[in-house]
């Protein structure tokens, strides 16, 4: 049995402070979700979640421990609404499985959970077991990226998936014809999740390299980066070094109203050629100058 502390009505400027306190109190896991559509939020270090209504879930092994933390948080920030819920082991570990169903992107790409048969066996099927910490393709930014990849000509192309998470974009690119993909992330859990999903899809080392971003050296035909605005801006020069003139950069992970900021920030190194929107999120396509 586990005990989940659900924290609502948390001011955005307090989220980082409260998550740090939860870590100090010994929370086994901390998850941030958007109250409106419940995507998993994977913020870069030092960044603050963008959504106006963020829910924090913290998991504890003992009810008394969770109750103590609840009391301490409310005493310090009275506006917080904290509720406590017991979770059976199976519910904590795989509660999301019931909601993860096969999804189609474009005309031929399916993302399917590893525990269900693909609806169209002859289609391009990506079998995914994302684990607890990473997305499944349901969030708008991942959906935008998968749909773009499905229609792109990736045959014999080299690709960098920057901020690979579960590896969903890396594996999709390989399934759709990419010759080699470099999946990079600053989170070791993400690298392990990508490795596990590559194994489930019979992807070999000749097709996929998994590493931290520092290992990137060779120029590629395409970079796809589904990360937040601040790291996207800070990585402009790095991306430009890895992309020869005319090569493509695809970015997502940014809100619709943030798109002009990124376009302006990239103007000296990249030409903006296309934009797609979905549920308030944007995907931007650039070519390297």
Curated annotation (Swiss-Prot):
Q: Which residues bind S-adenosyl-L-methionine?
A: 142, 163, 185, 226
Top EC category? transferase
- This chain's protein is named Ribosomal protein L11 methyltransferase
Q: Which domain of life is it from?
A: Bacteria
CDD domains per the record?
AdoMet_MTases
* Compartment(s) of residence: Cytoplasm
Enzyme Commission (EC) number:
2.1.1.-
Which Gene Ontology molecular-function terms are recorded? protein-lysine N-methyltransferase activity
Function of this protein? Methylates ribosomal protein L11.
GO terms for cellular component = cytosol
Biological process according to GO: methylation
Q: What is its main location?
A: cytoplasm
Reactions it catalyzes: L-lysyl-[protein] + 3 S-adenosyl-L-methionine = N(6),N(6),N(6)-trimethyl-L-lysyl-[protein] + 3 S-adenosyl-L-homocysteine + 3 H(+)
Family membership: Belongs to the methyltransferase superfamily. PrmA family.
Any one Pfam family match given in the protein's UniProt record, by short name: PrmA
What is the species listed in this Swiss-Prot or TrEMBL entry?
Legionella pneumophila (strain Corby)
Cite the entry's keywords alphabetically.
Cytoplasm, Methyltransferase, S-adenosyl-L-methionine, Transferase
């Amino acid at each position: 049995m586990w005990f989940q502390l659900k924290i609502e009505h948390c001011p955005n400027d307090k989220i980082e402070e409260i998550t740090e306190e939860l870590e100090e109190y010994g929370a086994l896991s901390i998850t941030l979700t958007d109250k409106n559509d419940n995507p998993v939020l994977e913020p870069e270090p030092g960044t603050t979640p963008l959504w106006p209504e963020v829910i924090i879930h913290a998991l504890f092994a003992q009810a008394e421990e969770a109750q103590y933390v609840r009391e301490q948080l409310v005493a310090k920030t009275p506006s917080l609404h904290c509720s406590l819920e017991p979770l059976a082991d199976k519910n904590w570990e795989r509660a999301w499985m019931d909601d993860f169903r096969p999804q189609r992107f474009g005309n031929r790409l399916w993302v399917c959970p590893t525990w269900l048969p693909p609806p169209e066996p002859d289609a391009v099927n990506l079998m995914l077991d994302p684990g607890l910490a990473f997305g499944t393709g349901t969030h708008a930014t991942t959906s935008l990226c998968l749909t773009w990849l499905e229609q792109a000509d990736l045959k014999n192309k080299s690709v960098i998936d920057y901020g690979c998470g579960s590896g969903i974009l890396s594996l999709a690119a390989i399934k759709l014809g990419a010759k080699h993909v470099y999946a990079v992330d600053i989170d070791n859990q993400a690298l392990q999740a990508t490795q596990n999903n590559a194994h489930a899809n019979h992807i070999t080392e000749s097709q996929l390299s998994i590493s931290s971003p520092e290992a990137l050296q060779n120029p590629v035909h395409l970079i796809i980066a589904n990360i937040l605005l601040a790291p996207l801006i800070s990585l402009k020069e790095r991306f430009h070094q890895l992309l020869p003139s005319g090569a493509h950069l695809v970015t997502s992970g940014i809100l619709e109203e943030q798109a002009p900021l990124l376009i302006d920030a990239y103007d000296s190194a990249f030409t903006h050629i296309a934009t797609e929107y979905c549920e308030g999120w944007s995907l931007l396509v650039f070519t390297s100058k």
